[in-house]
Amino acid sequence: MGYGLVKDDGSVFIEKEATEGVYQAEQAGASAAEVLSDGLEFVPTKELLERNNRTSTVETVVSRVGQKSMAGTVPTEFKAGANEGDETETAALYEALLGGKDALLERTSLTSHTTTKLFLTGGEELQYKKGHIVKVKQSEIAGVDHVSPIVEVDSTFGIESITLLVPYGSAFSDNVKISASTQFYHKSGQPTLSVTNYLGGEIREKAIGMRPVSAELANFATGQLPEMSFSLEGLDFAREVGTPLFDPAYDSQEGAEPPVVLCSKVYKDATELTLNSLSISFTNTLGFLTSTASCSGKISSRVTKFQVGFTINPYMENDDVDLFELFEDNTGFSIFGSSNNYGASEDEKEQVVAFYMPNCRIPEITTGDEDGILTDAINGTAHRDAGNDTIFLAFI
């Protein structure tokens, strides 16, 4: 018998399940996720069934236990893969949260571009959709790499193109490249996950049939490292003695790092906002299917509602009340932001992370302050509209 398991000697592996509720062990070292140590937890429970029996005493009789449940929190850094177009090592969590995933290939554009429109070889525009966030590799020719959401895809013969939300400072160069990337957006049919948490590297804890019920993009604040934390619920659990089947292989070993939130612009529509912090919350409402034939009680789950909210605190302008008017008139607008690391120069943006909410509303606005400087403290909501999903996340 031994004691003294060390917390940070543990590792976490995440796999999509082929069949919901059937445990999927790790298939490779790349299934490991480099999670944050603080806040990581899994809580197995059984429903307590109290027995209110009269037994000639006020003492209670032994309770029984019913349905099994598993809840967990997986905090992570909000970062891209080491190389352009790579999936982030936590891609399974994002796919389980949102459902939709597109892997975009690098494209070389044609000529005669504008500050927002890029012309493409016919057919190459078809991989894009409204809301995808792209990086134009302008630094390879002359200038600074440019990151923006797509607001229009045109497949008209002879003028196949994509149009960007945020204009570049001048017309894009001929034959400029558009980066490969991985994009996530909401789509039904999200996979369930098996999460294996190795406690101290010696005890195998299994969380089975897990779905994210909520997530939060936090710490997107001046000079900080952004984080994405996932809260999950599932169908079943188990714990046994066991060591990892594979040595963990982390993105950081290949050079992936979270960006520092500096030179990280946030836009309302195509207008840059001056703010100190931003957060985005995701909520999946789950409905569980149960069966008397199941030994754990729950047999499946479904996402019955998806909601996105955000908070921003732009500094209050001294010559307009535009944000208050958006609140008063319930007018829609978009929010887009990104952060990145750098390549050989600060013109070359690498390991870009970005978010885009095309259709936002402000149900609540108050007056706040940052070190005594007035701000508009905004609680907003994001919604789907014609041709757009509620939110897009991009890793470039």
Task: Walk through the language-model features, giving the residues of each.
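Signature of extracytoplasmic/envelope-associated structural regions
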Residues: 1-396
